[in-house]
């Protein structure tokens, strides 16, 4: 797991996004663990305690980061026949670095939008991740 590849922050998802968030948040003890099964190998981001780190899907982990980084989450607007409809897609706004702003593209969940915004605030539009995660 030594080869790294550049990935657009806007395209990060799953374990790749979780690892990038862990690095952006300064969780220096986080590590990428291969899980080998007879049919395939997959990866998890873990704390030294063995806790799986999944800020892009776990509100208990991602929620505090939204507060820490002051990420604004906005549902995608829909104007239906009966007025505004509930949206299943979200985007995030984040301000960083003395007033710079980043707005994500629409994402399937609020946590994914927030996590992408946090990664962008720390690393920019691209981030290096292990090639195995692509």
Can you describe what each PLM-predicted range is?
Residues 1-134:
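Glycine-rich anion-binding surface patch
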């Amino acid at each position: 797991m030594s080869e790294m590849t550049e990935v657009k922050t806007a395209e990060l998802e799953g374990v790749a996004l979780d690892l990038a968030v862990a690095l952006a948040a300064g969780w220096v003890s986080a590590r990428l663990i291969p899980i080998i099964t007879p049919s395939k190998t997959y990866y998890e981001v873990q704390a030294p305690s063995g806790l799986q780190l999944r800020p892009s899907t776990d509100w208990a982990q991602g929620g505090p980061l939204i507060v820490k980084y002051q990420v604004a989450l906005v549902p995608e607007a829909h104007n239906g026949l009966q007025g505004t409809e509930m949206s299943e897609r979200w985007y995030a706004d984040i301000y960083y670095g003395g007033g710079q702003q980043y707005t994500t593209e629409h994402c399937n969940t609020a946590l994914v939008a927030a996590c992408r915004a946090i990664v962008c605030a720390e690393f920019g539009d691209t981030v290096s991740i292990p090639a195995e995660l692509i």
